[in-house]
Protein backbone atom coordinates (compact mmCIF):
# COMPACT_ATOMS: atom_id res chain seq x y z
CA UNK A 1 0.00 0.00 0.00
CA UNK A 2 2.89 2.37 0.85
CA UNK A 3 4.55 1.65 -2.50
CA UNK A 4 1.31 2.45 -4.31
CA UNK A 5 0.99 5.82 -2.53
CA UNK A 6 4.62 6.68 -3.24
CA UNK A 7 4.13 5.83 -6.93
CA UNK A 8 0.96 7.96 -7.06
CA UNK A 9 2.73 10.94 -5.46
CA UNK A 10 5.63 10.69 -7.91
CA UNK A 11 3.17 10.45 -10.81
CA UNK A 12 1.44 13.69 -9.82
CA UNK A 13 4.78 15.41 -9.28
CA UNK A 14 6.11 14.51 -12.72
CA UNK A 15 2.74 14.84 -14.52
CA UNK A 16 3.35 18.50 -15.52
CA UNK A 17 6.68 17.51 -17.03
CA UNK A 18 5.04 14.76 -19.07
CA UNK A 19 1.97 16.56 -20.33
CA UNK A 20 3.43 20.05 -20.32
CA UNK A 21 3.14 22.92 -17.87
CA UNK A 22 -0.12 24.70 -18.52
CA UNK A 23 0.12 27.09 -15.57
CA UNK A 24 -1.89 30.26 -16.11
CA UNK A 25 0.05 32.91 -17.99
CA UNK A 26 -0.84 35.94 -20.06
CA UNK A 27 0.36 38.26 -22.79
CA UNK A 28 1.41 41.75 -21.72
CA UNK A 29 0.79 44.62 -24.11
CA UNK A 30 3.06 47.64 -23.61
CA UNK A 31 2.51 51.14 -24.96
CA UNK A 32 4.54 54.11 -23.74
CA UNK A 33 5.11 53.54 -20.03
CA UNK A 34 1.92 51.55 -19.44
CA UNK A 35 1.32 47.82 -19.55
CA UNK A 36 -1.92 45.95 -20.03
CA UNK A 37 -2.23 42.28 -19.06
CA UNK A 38 -4.51 40.12 -21.14
CA UNK A 39 -6.92 37.59 -19.79
CA UNK A 40 -5.26 34.26 -18.82
CA UNK A 41 -3.93 32.51 -21.93
CA UNK A 42 -1.41 29.76 -22.68
CA UNK A 43 -0.79 27.16 -25.42
CA UNK A 44 -3.77 25.19 -24.15
CA UNK A 45 -5.96 28.32 -24.05
CA UNK A 46 -4.38 30.30 -26.89
CA UNK A 47 -6.70 33.33 -27.12
CA UNK A 48 -5.33 36.43 -25.34
CA UNK A 49 -7.93 39.18 -25.03
CA UNK A 50 -7.75 42.87 -24.14
CA UNK A 51 -10.41 45.54 -23.75
CA UNK A 52 -8.75 48.89 -24.43
CA UNK A 53 -9.71 52.52 -24.74
CA UNK A 54 -8.13 54.49 -27.58
CA UNK A 55 -8.09 57.74 -25.61
CA UNK A 56 -6.26 56.02 -22.74
CA UNK A 57 -3.77 54.49 -25.21
CA UNK A 58 -3.09 57.95 -26.63
CA UNK A 59 -2.48 59.34 -23.13
CA UNK A 60 -0.11 56.45 -22.33
CA UNK A 61 1.86 56.87 -25.54
CA UNK A 62 2.11 60.65 -25.06
CA UNK A 63 4.26 60.12 -21.93
CA UNK A 64 6.93 58.28 -23.94
CA UNK A 65 6.24 58.81 -27.65
CA UNK A 66 8.14 56.57 -30.09
CA UNK A 67 8.65 59.47 -32.48
CA UNK A 68 8.28 63.27 -32.29
CA UNK A 69 5.15 65.13 -33.37
CA UNK A 70 2.98 62.04 -33.33
CA UNK A 71 -0.63 62.97 -34.02
CA UNK A 72 -2.86 62.01 -31.10
CA UNK A 73 -6.28 60.45 -31.26
CA UNK A 74 -9.27 62.72 -30.61
CA UNK A 75 -13.03 62.76 -31.04
CA UNK A 76 -12.47 63.93 -34.64
CA UNK A 77 -11.16 60.44 -35.51
CA UNK A 78 -13.95 58.54 -33.70
CA UNK A 79 -15.89 57.92 -36.91
CA UNK A 80 -12.99 56.29 -38.78
CA UNK A 81 -12.10 52.60 -38.81
CA UNK A 82 -8.97 50.99 -37.42
CA UNK A 83 -6.32 48.98 -39.26
CA UNK A 84 -3.76 46.65 -37.68
CA UNK A 85 -0.24 46.32 -39.13
CA UNK A 86 2.00 43.61 -37.57
CA UNK A 87 5.78 44.01 -37.59
CA UNK A 88 7.30 40.82 -38.99
CA UNK A 89 11.04 41.53 -38.71
CA UNK A 90 11.70 38.30 -36.77
CA UNK A 91 9.58 35.25 -36.29
CA UNK A 92 10.20 33.77 -32.81
CA UNK A 93 10.52 30.08 -32.04
CA UNK A 94 9.79 29.36 -28.39
CA UNK A 95 11.55 25.98 -28.54
CA UNK A 96 14.85 27.79 -29.04
CA UNK A 97 16.90 28.90 -32.06
CA UNK A 98 14.55 31.44 -33.56
CA UNK A 99 14.66 32.01 -37.28
CA UNK A 100 14.04 34.94 -39.59
CA UNK A 101 11.15 34.96 -41.98
CA UNK A 102 11.50 35.43 -45.72
CA UNK A 103 12.37 38.94 -46.82
CA UNK A 104 9.36 41.05 -47.56
CA UNK A 105 9.43 44.58 -48.94
CA UNK A 106 6.43 46.53 -47.74
CA UNK A 107 5.91 49.91 -49.46
CA UNK A 108 3.61 50.85 -46.57
CA UNK A 109 6.32 50.69 -43.91
CA UNK A 110 5.30 52.82 -40.97
CA UNK A 111 6.92 56.22 -40.78
CA UNK A 112 6.61 58.88 -38.08
CA UNK A 113 4.12 60.36 -37.95
CA UNK A 114 2.49 59.26 -41.19
CA UNK A 115 1.86 56.03 -43.06
CA UNK A 116 3.97 56.87 -46.10
CA UNK A 117 1.29 56.08 -48.71
CA UNK A 118 -2.42 56.23 -49.28
CA UNK A 119 -4.62 53.53 -47.82
CA UNK A 120 -5.88 52.24 -51.16
CA UNK A 121 -2.30 51.43 -52.30
CA UNK A 122 -1.45 49.38 -49.20
CA UNK A 123 -1.27 45.61 -49.72
CA UNK A 124 -3.37 44.69 -46.70
CA UNK A 125 -6.23 42.24 -46.85
CA UNK A 126 -9.17 43.07 -44.68
CA UNK A 127 -8.15 44.56 -41.36
CA UNK A 128 -4.65 43.06 -41.06
CA UNK A 129 -1.55 43.26 -43.30
CA UNK A 130 1.05 40.50 -43.08
CA UNK A 131 2.21 37.53 -45.17
CA UNK A 132 2.33 35.34 -42.03
CA UNK A 133 -0.69 36.46 -40.03
CA UNK A 134 -4.23 35.39 -40.67
CA UNK A 135 -6.91 37.76 -39.57
CA UNK A 136 -9.46 35.40 -38.02
CA UNK A 137 -7.00 32.82 -36.64
CA UNK A 138 -4.03 34.86 -35.42
CA UNK A 139 -5.61 38.20 -34.57
CA UNK A 140 -9.01 39.85 -34.76
CA UNK A 141 -10.51 42.88 -33.15
CA UNK A 142 -13.79 44.74 -32.86
CA UNK A 143 -14.16 48.48 -32.57
CA UNK A 144 -17.01 50.42 -30.98
CA UNK A 145 -16.13 54.10 -31.46
CA UNK A 146 -13.23 54.55 -28.98
CA UNK A 147 -13.55 51.11 -27.34
CA UNK A 148 -11.36 48.32 -28.74
CA UNK A 149 -11.45 44.55 -28.12
CA UNK A 150 -8.36 42.65 -29.35
CA UNK A 151 -8.04 38.85 -29.53
CA UNK A 152 -4.47 37.65 -30.21
CA UNK A 153 -3.29 34.07 -30.60
CA UNK A 154 -0.77 33.09 -27.94
CA UNK A 155 1.73 31.96 -30.61
CA UNK A 156 1.83 35.55 -31.92
CA UNK A 157 2.52 37.05 -28.51
CA UNK A 158 5.99 38.58 -28.84
CA UNK A 159 5.34 40.43 -32.08
CA UNK A 160 5.00 44.21 -32.06
CA UNK A 161 2.17 45.69 -34.10
CA UNK A 162 0.68 49.07 -34.88
CA UNK A 163 -2.85 50.38 -34.94
CA UNK A 164 -3.76 53.01 -37.51
CA UNK A 165 -6.81 55.24 -37.99
CA UNK A 166 -7.35 55.73 -41.70
CA UNK A 167 -8.36 59.39 -41.47
CA UNK A 168 -7.67 62.29 -43.87
CA UNK A 169 -4.42 64.09 -43.15
CA UNK A 170 -2.10 62.73 -40.50
CA UNK A 171 -3.24 59.34 -39.25
CA UNK A 172 -3.02 58.64 -35.50
CA UNK A 173 -0.78 55.61 -34.89
CA UNK A 174 -0.27 53.49 -31.79
CA UNK A 175 2.93 51.41 -31.49
CA UNK A 176 2.29 48.39 -29.24
CA UNK A 177 4.66 45.66 -28.05
CA UNK A 178 3.60 42.26 -26.76
CA UNK A 179 5.49 39.67 -24.73
CA UNK A 180 4.45 36.53 -22.85
CA UNK A 181 4.49 36.88 -19.08
CA UNK A 182 3.12 35.37 -15.92
CA UNK A 183 0.07 36.73 -14.24
CA UNK A 184 0.80 38.94 -11.22
CA UNK A 185 0.64 37.11 -7.88
CA UNK A 186 -2.47 39.04 -6.88
CA UNK A 187 -5.32 40.35 -8.96
CA UNK A 188 -4.85 43.93 -10.12
CA UNK A 189 -6.47 46.12 -7.46
CA UNK A 190 -7.11 48.98 -9.87
CA UNK A 191 -10.61 49.48 -11.14
CA UNK A 192 -11.49 50.81 -14.62
CA UNK A 193 -10.35 54.35 -15.33
CA UNK A 194 -13.86 55.78 -15.53
CA UNK A 195 -14.70 54.63 -11.98
CA UNK A 196 -13.45 57.26 -9.51
CA UNK A 197 -15.41 55.90 -6.53
CA UNK A 198 -12.69 53.56 -5.25
CA UNK A 199 -9.00 53.43 -6.13
CA UNK A 200 -6.83 50.68 -4.62
CA UNK A 201 -8.93 50.53 -1.43
CA UNK A 202 -12.70 50.17 -1.88
CA UNK A 203 -13.44 51.63 1.56
CA UNK A 204 -12.11 55.10 0.72
CA UNK A 205 -14.78 57.56 -0.51
CA UNK A 206 -12.86 59.16 -3.35
CA UNK A 207 -15.70 61.30 -4.61
CA UNK A 208 -15.76 63.40 -1.47
CA UNK A 209 -11.95 63.65 -1.39
CA UNK A 210 -11.75 64.81 -4.98
CA UNK A 211 -14.47 67.37 -4.37
CA UNK A 212 -12.60 68.59 -1.29
CA UNK A 213 -9.34 68.92 -3.22
CA UNK A 214 -11.06 70.75 -6.05
CA UNK A 215 -12.66 73.12 -3.54
CA UNK A 216 -9.28 73.82 -1.90
CA UNK A 217 -7.69 74.42 -5.31
CA UNK A 218 -10.42 76.87 -6.27
CA UNK A 219 -9.99 78.72 -2.99
CA UNK A 220 -6.21 78.91 -3.44
CA UNK A 221 -6.66 80.48 -6.89
CA UNK A 222 -9.35 82.86 -5.60
CA UNK A 223 -11.78 81.24 -8.03
CA UNK A 224 -9.91 82.61 -11.05
CA UNK A 225 -9.10 79.24 -12.65
CA UNK A 226 -10.93 76.20 -13.90
CA UNK A 227 -9.81 72.88 -12.37
CA UNK A 228 -9.71 70.00 -14.86
CA UNK A 229 -9.25 66.35 -13.83
CA UNK A 230 -7.69 64.04 -16.41
CA UNK A 231 -9.22 60.55 -16.26
CA UNK A 232 -6.49 58.95 -18.34
CA UNK A 233 -4.73 55.65 -17.70
CA UNK A 234 -3.86 54.98 -14.06
CA UNK A 235 -0.17 54.88 -14.96
CA UNK A 236 -0.36 58.63 -15.61
CA UNK A 237 -1.68 59.44 -12.14
CA UNK A 238 0.36 61.50 -9.68
CA UNK A 239 1.45 60.78 -6.13
CA UNK A 240 1.91 63.15 -3.22
CA UNK A 241 4.00 61.61 -0.46
CA UNK A 242 5.51 62.69 2.82
CA UNK A 243 9.25 61.91 3.14
CA UNK A 244 8.93 62.21 6.92
CA UNK A 245 7.19 58.82 7.13
CA UNK A 246 9.56 55.89 6.70
CA UNK A 247 8.73 52.85 4.57
CA UNK A 248 9.09 49.41 6.21
CA UNK A 249 12.06 47.42 4.96
CA UNK A 250 9.99 44.26 4.67
CA UNK A 251 9.37 42.84 1.22
CA UNK A 252 6.37 44.44 -0.44
CA UNK A 253 4.70 44.10 -3.82
CA UNK A 254 4.71 47.08 -6.22
CA UNK A 255 1.15 47.95 -7.16
CA UNK A 256 1.44 51.07 -9.30
CA UNK A 257 4.25 53.00 -10.96
CA UNK A 258 3.02 56.60 -11.18
CA UNK A 259 4.25 59.02 -13.80
CA UNK A 260 4.99 61.74 -11.24
CA UNK A 261 5.78 61.64 -7.51
CA UNK A 262 6.07 64.90 -5.58
CA UNK A 263 7.34 65.17 -2.00
CA UNK A 264 5.13 67.29 0.24
CA UNK A 265 6.72 67.39 3.71
CA UNK A 266 4.80 70.45 4.92
CA UNK A 267 1.47 69.79 3.23
CA UNK A 268 -1.53 69.70 5.53
CA UNK A 269 -4.34 67.59 4.13
CA UNK A 270 -7.98 67.73 5.20
CA UNK A 271 -7.80 63.93 5.54
CA UNK A 272 -5.16 61.29 6.30
CA UNK A 273 -2.68 59.69 3.92
CA UNK A 274 -4.11 56.57 2.31
CA UNK A 275 -1.31 54.67 0.51
CA UNK A 276 2.30 53.64 0.88
CA UNK A 277 4.89 55.02 -1.57
CA UNK A 278 8.45 53.74 -1.75
CA UNK A 279 10.75 56.51 -3.08
CA UNK A 280 13.56 54.05 -3.83
CA UNK A 281 11.60 52.09 -6.43
CA UNK A 282 9.19 54.97 -7.23
CA UNK A 283 6.10 52.80 -6.84
CA UNK A 284 3.05 52.35 -4.68
CA UNK A 285 3.66 49.22 -2.61
CA UNK A 286 1.44 46.97 -0.56
CA UNK A 287 3.00 47.89 2.81
CA UNK A 288 0.64 49.68 5.22
CA UNK A 289 2.81 52.75 5.87
CA UNK A 290 0.26 55.40 4.79
CA UNK A 291 2.58 58.15 3.61
CA UNK A 292 1.12 59.08 0.23
CA UNK A 293 -1.98 59.95 -1.71
CA UNK A 294 -2.82 59.00 -5.31
CA UNK A 295 -4.52 61.67 -7.38
CA UNK A 296 -5.47 62.03 -11.03
CA UNK A 297 -3.55 64.71 -12.94
CA UNK A 298 -4.88 68.20 -12.24
CA UNK A 299 -4.63 71.04 -14.69
CA UNK A 300 -5.59 74.67 -14.19
CA UNK A 301 -7.07 76.74 -16.97
CA UNK A 302 -7.84 80.46 -16.62
CA UNK A 303 -11.48 81.40 -16.65
CA UNK A 304 -12.29 83.07 -19.98
CA UNK A 305 -13.30 86.67 -19.68
CA UNK A 306 -16.86 87.24 -20.71
CA UNK A 307 -17.19 90.17 -23.06
CA UNK A 308 -20.00 92.62 -22.49
CA UNK A 309 -22.79 92.09 -24.92
CA UNK A 310 -23.95 95.17 -26.78
CA UNK A 311 -27.70 94.88 -26.93
CA UNK A 312 -28.05 98.07 -28.97
CA UNK A 313 -26.35 96.49 -31.95
CA UNK A 314 -29.37 94.50 -33.06
CA UNK A 315 -32.03 97.33 -32.77
CA UNK A 316 -29.77 99.88 -34.46
CA UNK A 317 -29.05 97.45 -37.25
CA UNK A 318 -32.73 96.64 -37.61
CA UNK A 319 -33.72 100.30 -37.82
CA UNK A 320 -30.88 101.00 -40.23
CA UNK A 321 -31.92 98.14 -42.47
CA UNK A 322 -35.56 99.20 -42.18
CA UNK A 323 -34.72 102.79 -43.15
CA UNK A 324 -32.69 101.61 -46.11
CA UNK A 325 -35.49 99.28 -47.16
CA UNK A 326 -38.07 102.05 -46.82
CA UNK A 327 -35.93 104.45 -48.83
CA UNK A 328 -35.43 101.83 -51.51
CA UNK A 329 -39.18 101.14 -51.50
CA UNK A 330 -40.09 104.83 -51.82
CA UNK A 331 -37.58 105.27 -54.62
CA UNK A 332 -38.95 102.18 -56.32
CA UNK A 333 -42.52 103.40 -55.87
CA UNK A 334 -41.74 106.83 -57.35
CA UNK A 335 -39.87 105.26 -60.23
CA UNK A 336 -42.73 102.84 -60.84
CA UNK A 337 -45.32 105.61 -60.70
CA UNK A 338 -43.35 107.70 -63.17
CA UNK A 339 -42.97 104.73 -65.48
CA UNK A 340 -46.69 104.00 -65.20
CA UNK A 341 -47.51 107.65 -65.94
CA UNK A 342 -45.29 107.60 -69.01
CA UNK A 343 -46.91 104.33 -70.04
CA UNK A 344 -50.34 105.87 -69.61
CA UNK A 345 -49.41 108.83 -71.83
CA UNK A 346 -48.06 106.41 -74.41
CA UNK A 347 -51.33 104.46 -74.33
CA UNK A 348 -53.26 107.71 -74.74
CA UNK A 349 -51.24 108.66 -77.82
CA UNK A 350 -51.68 105.20 -79.32
CA UNK A 351 -55.41 105.34 -78.59
CA UNK A 352 -55.61 108.76 -80.33
CA UNK A 353 -53.87 107.36 -83.41
CA UNK A 354 -56.24 104.39 -83.46
CA UNK A 355 -59.28 106.70 -83.26
CA UNK A 356 -57.97 108.80 -86.15
CA UNK A 357 -57.40 105.68 -88.22
CA UNK A 358 -60.91 104.50 -87.37
CA UNK A 359 -62.41 107.84 -88.49
CA UNK A 360 -60.46 107.71 -91.76
CA UNK A 361 -61.69 104.17 -92.43
CA UNK A 362 -65.30 105.24 -91.71
CA UNK A 363 -65.00 108.20 -94.12
CA UNK A 364 -63.56 105.99 -96.84
CA UNK A 365 -66.38 103.51 -96.22
CA UNK A 366 -68.97 106.27 -96.66
CA UNK A 367 -67.31 107.48 -99.86
CA UNK A 368 -67.29 103.93 -101.17
CA UNK A 369 -71.02 103.63 -100.47
CA UNK A 370 -71.69 106.86 -102.37
CA UNK A 371 -69.67 105.63 -105.35
CA UNK A 372 -71.66 102.39 -105.27
CA UNK A 373 -74.90 104.37 -105.29
CA UNK A 374 -73.69 106.39 -108.27
CA UNK A 375 -72.76 103.19 -110.14
CA UNK A 376 -76.16 101.64 -109.41
CA UNK A 377 -77.92 104.75 -110.65
CA UNK A 378 -75.94 104.75 -113.90
CA UNK A 379 -76.62 101.03 -114.28
CA UNK A 380 -80.37 101.58 -114.10
CA UNK A 381 -80.13 104.37 -116.74
CA UNK A 382 -78.17 102.17 -119.13
CA UNK A 383 -80.65 99.32 -118.64
CA UNK A 384 -83.45 101.68 -119.78
CA UNK A 385 -81.46 102.67 -122.87
CA UNK A 386 -80.88 99.05 -123.88
CA UNK A 387 -84.40 97.94 -122.97
CA UNK A 388 -85.19 96.77 -126.47
CA UNK A 389 -82.05 94.60 -126.54
CA UNK A 390 -82.79 93.02 -123.18
CA UNK A 391 -80.73 95.31 -120.97
CA UNK A 392 -77.10 96.35 -120.65
CA UNK A 393 -75.75 92.90 -119.93
CA UNK A 394 -77.47 91.38 -123.03
CA UNK A 395 -76.25 94.20 -125.22
CA UNK A 396 -72.65 93.73 -123.96
CA UNK A 397 -73.04 89.95 -123.90
CA UNK A 398 -71.41 89.80 -120.42
CA UNK A 399 -72.43 88.40 -117.06
CA UNK A 400 -74.20 90.91 -114.86
CA UNK A 401 -72.35 91.97 -111.68
CA UNK A 402 -73.94 93.54 -108.59
CA UNK A 403 -72.20 95.41 -105.69
CA UNK A 404 -72.09 93.57 -102.32
CA UNK A 405 -70.76 96.06 -99.77
CA UNK A 406 -71.22 94.98 -96.11
CA UNK A 407 -71.57 97.57 -93.37
CA UNK A 408 -71.16 95.33 -90.25
CA UNK A 409 -67.37 95.65 -89.58
CA UNK A 410 -67.25 99.41 -89.21
CA UNK A 411 -69.70 99.53 -86.23
CA UNK A 412 -67.66 96.82 -84.46
CA UNK A 413 -64.52 98.90 -84.91
CA UNK A 414 -66.25 101.95 -83.51
CA UNK A 415 -67.69 100.09 -80.49
CA UNK A 416 -64.30 98.81 -79.13
CA UNK A 417 -63.32 100.40 -75.74
CA UNK A 418 -60.28 102.64 -75.42
CA UNK A 419 -56.87 100.99 -75.30
CA UNK A 420 -56.16 102.23 -71.75
CA UNK A 421 -59.11 100.21 -70.43
CA UNK A 422 -57.98 97.07 -72.22
CA UNK A 423 -54.34 97.03 -70.91
CA UNK A 424 -53.68 95.89 -67.27
CA UNK A 425 -51.10 97.92 -65.32
CA UNK A 426 -49.53 97.74 -61.86
CA UNK A 427 -49.72 94.29 -60.20
CA UNK A 428 -51.80 92.77 -62.96
CA UNK A 429 -54.99 93.38 -60.97
CA UNK A 430 -57.65 95.42 -62.64
CA UNK A 431 -58.84 96.99 -59.41
CA UNK A 432 -60.36 100.39 -59.82
CA UNK A 433 -61.91 101.05 -56.38
CA UNK A 434 -63.16 104.32 -57.72
CA UNK A 435 -59.68 105.87 -57.36
CA UNK A 436 -57.50 107.71 -59.76
CA UNK A 437 -54.39 106.22 -61.31
CA UNK A 438 -52.03 108.06 -58.92
CA UNK A 439 -54.05 106.93 -55.88
CA UNK A 440 -53.96 103.31 -57.01
CA UNK A 441 -50.18 103.42 -57.53
CA UNK A 442 -49.62 105.04 -54.13
CA UNK A 443 -51.73 102.32 -52.48
CA UNK A 444 -49.73 99.58 -54.17
CA UNK A 445 -46.42 101.18 -53.10
CA UNK A 446 -47.61 101.49 -49.48
CA UNK A 447 -48.64 97.83 -49.30
CA UNK A 448 -45.23 96.82 -50.72
CA UNK A 449 -43.36 98.89 -48.13
CA UNK A 450 -45.40 97.49 -45.22
CA UNK A 451 -44.78 93.90 -46.36
CA UNK A 452 -41.05 94.55 -46.76
CA UNK A 453 -40.84 96.22 -43.34
CA UNK A 454 -42.58 93.29 -41.64
CA UNK A 455 -40.18 90.86 -43.35
CA UNK A 456 -37.14 92.82 -42.16
CA UNK A 457 -38.45 93.07 -38.57
CA UNK A 458 -39.20 89.33 -38.38
CA UNK A 459 -36.15 87.88 -40.15
CA UNK A 460 -33.56 90.63 -39.62
CA UNK A 461 -32.61 89.95 -35.96
CA UNK A 462 -32.27 86.20 -36.56
CA UNK A 463 -29.96 86.70 -39.55
CA UNK A 464 -27.85 89.28 -37.70
CA UNK A 465 -27.56 86.99 -34.65
CA UNK A 466 -26.36 84.10 -36.77
CA UNK A 467 -23.82 86.30 -38.54
CA UNK A 468 -22.63 87.64 -35.20
CA UNK A 469 -21.98 84.17 -33.73
CA UNK A 470 -20.32 82.83 -36.90
CA UNK A 471 -16.73 83.92 -36.00
CA UNK A 472 -16.98 82.31 -32.56
CA UNK A 473 -18.01 79.01 -34.15
CA UNK A 474 -15.05 79.03 -36.53
CA UNK A 475 -12.43 80.22 -34.01
CA UNK A 476 -11.97 78.35 -30.72
CA UNK A 477 -10.25 80.13 -27.79
CA UNK A 478 -6.97 78.60 -26.64
CA UNK A 479 -5.98 78.74 -23.01
CA UNK A 480 -2.55 77.78 -21.75
CA UNK A 481 -2.54 75.06 -19.11
CA UNK A 482 -0.70 75.47 -15.84
CA UNK A 483 0.85 72.23 -14.68
CA UNK A 484 -0.12 71.21 -11.14
CA UNK A 485 3.50 70.80 -10.04
CA UNK A 486 4.08 74.53 -10.51
CA UNK A 487 1.66 75.30 -7.68
CA UNK A 488 3.10 72.77 -5.21
Swiss-Prot record:
SUPFAM superfamilies: Virus ectodomain. Glycans are attached at residues 140, 222, 244, 272, 404. It comes from the Viruses. GO terms for cellular component: host cell plasma membrane; membrane; viral envelope; virion membrane. Residues 464-488 are cytoplasmic. Residues 21-442 are extracellular. Residues 313-333 are annotated as: Fusion peptide. Residues 341-387, 397-429 form a coiled coil. The record marks 312-313 as: Cleavage. A lipid is attached at residue 462 (S-palmitoyl cysteine). Pfam families: TLV_coat (PF00429). GO terms for biological process: fusion of virus membrane with host plasma membrane; symbiont entry into host cell; virion attachment to host cell. Specific enzymatic cleavages in vivo yield mature proteins. Envelope glycoproteins are synthesized as an inactive precursor that is N-glycosylated and processed likely by host cell furin or by a furin-like protease in the Golgi to yield the mature SU and TM proteins. The cleavage site between SU and TM requires the minimal sequence [KR]-X-[KR]-R. The transmembrane protein is palmitoylated. The chain crosses the membrane at residues 443-463. Disulfide bonds join 393-400. The keyword Aminoacyl-tRNA synthetase does not apply. Keywords: Cleavage on pair of basic residues, Coiled coil, Disulfide bond, Fusion of virus membrane with host cell membrane, Fusion of virus membrane with host membrane, Glycoprotein, Host cell membrane, Host membrane, Host-virus interaction, Lipoprotein, Membrane, Palmitate, Signal, Transmembrane, Transmembrane helix, Viral attachment to host cell, Viral envelope protein, Viral penetration into host cytoplasm, Virion, Virus entry into host cell. Residues 376-392 are annotated as: Immunosuppression. PANTHER family: ERVV2 PROTEIN, VIRAL ENVELOPE PROTEIN. The 17 amino acids long immunosuppressive region is present in many retroviral envelope proteins. Synthetic peptides derived from this relatively conserved sequence inhibit immune function in vitro and in vivo. The surface protein (SU) attaches the virus to the host cell by binding to its receptor. This interaction triggers the refolding of the transmembrane protein (TM) and is thought to activate its fusogenic potential by unmasking its fusion peptide. Fusion occurs at the host cell plasma membrane. The transmembrane protein (TM) acts as a class I viral fusion protein. Under the current model, the protein has at least 3 conformational states: pre-fusion native state, pre-hairpin intermediate state, and post-fusion hairpin state. During viral and target cell membrane fusion, the coiled coil regions (heptad repeats) assume a trimer-of-hairpins structure, positioning the fusion peptide in close proximity to the C-terminal region of the ectodomain. The formation of this structure appears to drive apposition and subsequent fusion of viral and target cell membranes. This is Envelope glycoprotein gp62. It comes from Human T-cell leukemia virus 1 (strain Japan ATK-1 subtype A). The lineage of its organism: Viruses, Riboviria, Pararnavirae, Artverviricota, Revtraviricetes.
Amino acid sequence: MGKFLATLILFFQFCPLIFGDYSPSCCTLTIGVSSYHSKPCNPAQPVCSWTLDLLALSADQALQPPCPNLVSYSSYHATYSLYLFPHWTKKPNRNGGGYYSASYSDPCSLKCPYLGCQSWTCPYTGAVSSPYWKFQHDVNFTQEVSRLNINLHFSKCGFPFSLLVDAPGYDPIWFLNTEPSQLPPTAPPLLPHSNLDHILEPSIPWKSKLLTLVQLTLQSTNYTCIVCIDRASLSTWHVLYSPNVSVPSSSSTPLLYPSLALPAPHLTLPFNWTHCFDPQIQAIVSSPCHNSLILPPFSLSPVPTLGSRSRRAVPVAVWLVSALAMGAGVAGGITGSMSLASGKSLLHEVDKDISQLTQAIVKNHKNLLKIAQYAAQNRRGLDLLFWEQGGLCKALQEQCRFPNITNSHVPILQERPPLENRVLTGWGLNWDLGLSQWAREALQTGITLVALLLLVILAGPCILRQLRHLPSRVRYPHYSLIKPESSL
